[in-house]
């Protein structure tokens, strides 16, 4: 098993137990055409309008029971034609890895242009204990490499890409229909508001903070963007308010003595 998958599947659940770092939304249908699937500590997101559904992220590699989750939310993954990936980490991009079963077999994949360097093995994903660790996800050729501020119209659904490098170099957020923000792993949110995502998992924390400042400014200064909901990778779904960006100059912190989110599950990986 490749190291990043081994860490995600076998190690992460043990070292993170009791630290309450994540509070993903439960699998289900929410307001504003939003649906999600929970896979342990992470969410896959969906947005539906006028019979058209787009997906944001693909979750883990070969995640057991994902078929039942799709049935629960009433979405057929084979009918999804477009999936927007926030970044190429194993818990967000594993579901379309060529080494496993592609949960969106008929979808065009969209991914931040700079993520290609991780997929190609040209750069490492993180350094731990002096060891450079590469991403191990591989996806099929033909994905669309997104630039900042690209705009798409898919069956009447408007999608705007916002480049937010830091967690990874090609990390990308998506604003959908000017009212839903999908943040991937640039934000961690608790009852006090939003923080820059945890340094432990973020490749360039200072860069991530700068990206969040730019993202907030874009939202504040663009009249047609009227956010209603924020959908995160690991903090669930939140109604948009000023607290979402309240602490973006600080990195989120977690420990057993001082959990990040008191409302989060003690063990996010229990099924």
Predicted feature residues:
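Metallo-beta-lactamase
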Residues: 13-17, 23-24, 61, 113-165, 169-243, 247
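Short amphipathic alpha-helical segments
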Residues: 67-68, 96-98, 123-124, 177, ...
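Active-site HxH/HxHxD metal-binding segment of metal-dependent hydrolases
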Residues: 62-64, 71-150, 250-257, 261-265
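C-terminal regulatory/interaction regions
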Residues: 2-11, 260-271
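Short catalytic-loop micro-motif centered on adjacent basic/acidic residues
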Residues: 54-57, 83-84, 161-163
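Conserved beta-strand hairpin/beta-sheet module of binuclear metal-dependent hydrolase folds
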Residues: 19-73, 173-184, 188-190
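Hydrophobic/aromatic beta-strand patches that form the interior of the parallel beta-sheet core
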Residues: 35, 84, 110, 144-146, ...
């Amino acid at each position: 098993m490749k190291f990043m998958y081994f860490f995600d599947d076998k190690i992460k659940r043990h070292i993170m137990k009791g630290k309450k770092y994540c509070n993903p939304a439960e699998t289900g249908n929410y307001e504003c055409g939003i649906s999600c699937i929970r896979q342990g500590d992470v969410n896959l997101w969906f947005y539906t309008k006028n019979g058209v559904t787009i997906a944001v992220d693909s979750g883990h590699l070969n995640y057991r029971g994902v078929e039942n989750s799709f049935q629960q939310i009433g979405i057929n993954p084979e009918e999804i034609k477009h999936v927007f990936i926030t970044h190429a980490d194993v818990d967000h991009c594993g579901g379309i890895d060529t080494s496993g079963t592609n949960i969106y077999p008929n979808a065009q994949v969209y991914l931040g242009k700079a993520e290609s360097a991780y997929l190609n093995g040209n750069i490492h994903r993180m350094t731990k204990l002096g060891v450079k660790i590469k991403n191990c996800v591989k996806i099929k050729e033909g994905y669309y490499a997104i630039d900042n501020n690209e705009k798409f119209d898919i069956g009447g659904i408007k999608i705007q890409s916002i480049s937010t490098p830091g967690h990874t170099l090609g990390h990308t957020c998506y604003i959908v229909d000017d009212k839903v923000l999908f943040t991937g792993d640039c934000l961690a949110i608790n009852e006090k508001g939003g923080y820059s995502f945890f340094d432990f998992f973020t490749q360039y924390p200072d860069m991530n903070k700068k990206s969040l400042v730019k993202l907030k400014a874009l939202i504040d200064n663009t009249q047609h963007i009227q956010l209603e909901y924020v959908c995160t990778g690991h903090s669930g779904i939140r109604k948009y308010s000023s607290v979402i960006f309240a602490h973006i100059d600080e990195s989120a912190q977690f420990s057993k003595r001082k959990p990040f989110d008191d409302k989060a599950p003690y063990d996010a990986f229990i099924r």
